[in-house]
Amino acid sequence: MVSVGKKAPDFEMAGFYKGEFKTFRLSEYLGKWVVLCFYPGDFTFVUATEVSAVAEKYPEFQKLGVEVLSVSVDSVFVHKMWNDNELSKMVEGGIPFPMLSDGGGNVGTLYGVYDPEAGVENRGRFLIDPDGIIQGYEVLILPVGRNVSETLRQIQAFQLVRETKGAEVAPSGWKPGKKTLKPGPGLVGNVYKEWSVKEAFED
């Protein structure tokens, strides 16, 4: 079973990407941040909103040095049909990242998101750092979509912690430009002096 702070299981899957069918390995992305998104199925309702929303924000992921990989049990042929016939009408240019095929749910099982009774992946999102370590993940039931803006915010927070080697940490609701906390003996019992609850909700 996967866990934060542990190595993300490697995999190899066929995928549809920029009009071509290719093979992708997670280990090929070492040295980069990766958002690995599992979703239930092509030509479904919430999935269309999620995948297109990630595509719309893809330039922002790229600015942060992040690669995106989407995964479902659908074949690469169905991925192509979905992109060409629906998703390309929702976001200009269609999907700009690989759409991977996990037929049988083997990779989803490795990541704990495959539902063998339903035969689909649950909505799992894994944030993987350049060392291949899982920094965070979220798994939702099928009818509820994920928040892409929150994914971007969390990546920025993880990058802050990585860049400062833990000398600074990100409090609730932190965004770039907002106050961080610096762990140390002097902060014990004194967080209220450095941070107020309203800061969690300020833009």
Swiss-Prot record:
GO biological process entries: cell redox homeostasis; cellular response to stress; hydrogen peroxide catabolic process; response to oxidative stress
PROSITE patterns named among the record's database cross-references: THIOREDOXIN_2
Gene Ontology CC terms, in alphabetical order: cytosol
Keywords: Antioxidant, Oxidoreductase, Peroxidase, Redox-active center, Selenocysteine
Enzyme class: oxidoreductase
Catalytic activity: a hydroperoxide + [thioredoxin]-dithiol = an alcohol + [thioredoxin]-disulfide + H2O
Pfam families the record matches: 1-cysPrx_C (PF10417), AhpC-TSA (PF00578)
A molecular function (GO) term: thioredoxin peroxidase activity
Active site residues of this protein: 47
Limits of the Thioredoxin domain: 2-160
EC number from the UniProt entry: 1.11.1.24
Function: Thiol-specific peroxidase that catalyzes the reduction of hydrogen peroxide and organic hydroperoxides to water and alcohols, respectively. Plays a role in cell protection against oxidative stress by detoxifying peroxides.
Family: Belongs to the peroxiredoxin family. AhpC/Prx1 subfamily.
Name this protein carries in UniProt: Selenocysteine-containing peroxiredoxin PrxU
Annotated source species: Peptoclostridium acidaminophilum
Gene name in the database record: prxU
